[in-house]
Structures are given as structure tokens and as C-alpha cells.
Amino acid sequence: GSDSTALAYTMHELRQSGDVGPVALLHVNHKLRGQDAEDDAEFCRQLAEALTFPFFCCEVDVATEAALAHENAEAQGRRERYAAAREALDSLCMHEAVPLAEGRIVTAHTADDRVENFYMRSIVGTGPGGFRSMLYRNGNVVRPLLDCTRSDLRSFVRGLAETEGATVVLDERGNLWREDATNAHT
């Protein structure tokens, strides 16, 4: 989506300026959306190639895994994404000779996600610590975009596309990012 695409471009800028070490891009195909999911993976591959990031891609049949675990697909998908991110981080750190303790999993969570998370926990119910806000850093997971709105990030990507000489990738329809229709309700 636009959040992850903006994060990729931001990490590229930080990598180019030497402010961060090696960066890779990960895409997890949950096998829930047929050809759209395949097109998402291809867009991510092209984005990683354009930004000269190593690309990690995996496929997980989240619906089947969720049924086996007696879990909802969204929670199972989250677990699978973080498991894949840990594996990608291990691989990148080993390949780049960077101590794993220095590696980070960087996610594109935004201010919008923070609000959505609060309301979801309110509806579902939660324990005493459940209303804590998303953390900027939790172990090796970093969320640098928590103060940015989705609208901010879309404006950033659109602005980048208008910048002469900027590296920008378009999907097969000419869009600056891919939209997951299953997220339209949030």
C-alpha cells in the first residue's frame, strides 16, 4: 500500500545518505486475493529492484493456517509477517556481516493505524495494558511513521513522483502504489 511504498522510498533515501545500514524489502503473499496478490508481489519485486534492495518474498496460505490454529486470518497473517520478517532479518544480517542485535524490522504503521488499533481493542476488549499506544520501538521492531498520516504519506509519494530524476515505480495500471481492497473497510 501507500504506507509501505512511502517507507521503502524513505529507507532508500536514508540508505543513500548513509544514515542507515543495509536495507531489504519483504513481501508476504497471504494467498487470499488471487491475481491481485500476485500483482502486489510483482510490484514489490520491481520496487526492490529499482531501489537496489535485496528482495525477500514468501507465500503463506493464511486461511488454511488460521483454520488449523483456530485463529482469525488477520491475526494469523500478522504472525506470519513477523515470522517472515525475522527470517529475512537473520538472512540480511548474516549476508551483510551485521550483528543481528543491530538489525531492525521497520514497519509502515501510521497514525491512522494507531487510531484503528485503539478502536479495535476497545471493541474486542483487552486486558489492563491493552490500551497502550503502538510503540515506536519494541525490541528490534521499529515504527518510524507513527506520527505520519496515510494522507501525509500519499502526498509524499505523489511529490516524489513529480521530482525530476527521482526513482519511482508504477504498477501495471500506472499507480504509484498497490491498494489491497480487503483493507478498504478500515
How should each PLM-predicted stretch be described?
Residues 2-186:
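Core alpha/beta nucleotide-donor-binding catalytic domains of modification enzymes
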